[in-house]
Amino acid sequence: MKRIGLFGGTFDPPHLGHLLIAQEALTAVKLDEVWFVPVSTPPHKERAGLTSGKDRYDMVKAALVQEERFRVCDIELIRKGKSYTIDTVRELKQTYPDDEFFFLIGGDMVNMLPEWRGIDELKQLVTFVAFNRPGASAKSQPDVHFVPFVEVNISSSLIRERLAKGKPIRYFVTPAVEQLIEERNLYGDNNE
């Protein structure tokens, strides 16, 4: 039986903050692996211009090459349409019935959990692990494991903004992700 962390997100693009959270999850919750799960269409975020699923998958895969306990899972990209966590977890539990799943979320998402589709069933299928930033105001919940986490002020939207302005993104993403963005010109003209 493996202890597997599921880390869902748009990963548009994946950045070092994502990797730091996954690394912290390995030790804080004693996980065997962390699976990055790029969403097809996030139900809670409407953003025009979402980079293609293939490009986001490739960027995540490129970002993970240094850590053998990280992998990318394309289950939601294959399914297409809106990505609901309950559907993903049901499918994974069916495929991997002996494994224990932990769902990684930001502390800011904890207060929104009651609004998630199928949340009562989901709480039976996974353990939620929330990464709390210092000073965050997430309500303590008995069915959520909180992990204190130093805030890393990197976001995918900040990286896209920097690229749009022709600013470098080195030290925000891995070199492999930076190279892929440049080769495919994923976010418009970028110089570095």
Curated annotation (Swiss-Prot):
Listed EC numbers: 2.7.7.18
Pathway: Cofactor biosynthesis; NAD(+) biosynthesis; deamido-NAD(+) from nicotinate D-ribonucleotide: step 1/1
A molecular function (GO) term: ATP binding
CDD domains reported in the protein's UniProt record: NMNAT
A matching Pfam family: CTP_transf_like
Keyword list, A-Z: ATP-binding, NAD, Nucleotide-binding, Nucleotidyltransferase, Pyridine nucleotide biosynthesis, Transferase
Catalysed transformations (reactions): nicotinate beta-D-ribonucleotide + ATP + H(+) = deamido-NAD(+) + diphosphate
Keyword Cell membrane: no
InterPro entries, per the entry: Cyt_trans-like (IPR004821), NadD/NMNAT (IPR005248), Rossmann-like_a/b/a_fold (IPR014729)
GO terms for biological process, alphabetical: NAD biosynthetic process
EC top class named in words: transferase
Similarity annotation: Belongs to the NadD family.
Name of the protein in question: Probable nicotinate-nucleotide adenylyltransferase
Taxonomic source organism: Shouchella clausii (strain KSM-K16) (Alkalihalobacillus clausii)
Lineage: Bacteria, Bacillati, Bacillota, Bacilli, Bacillales
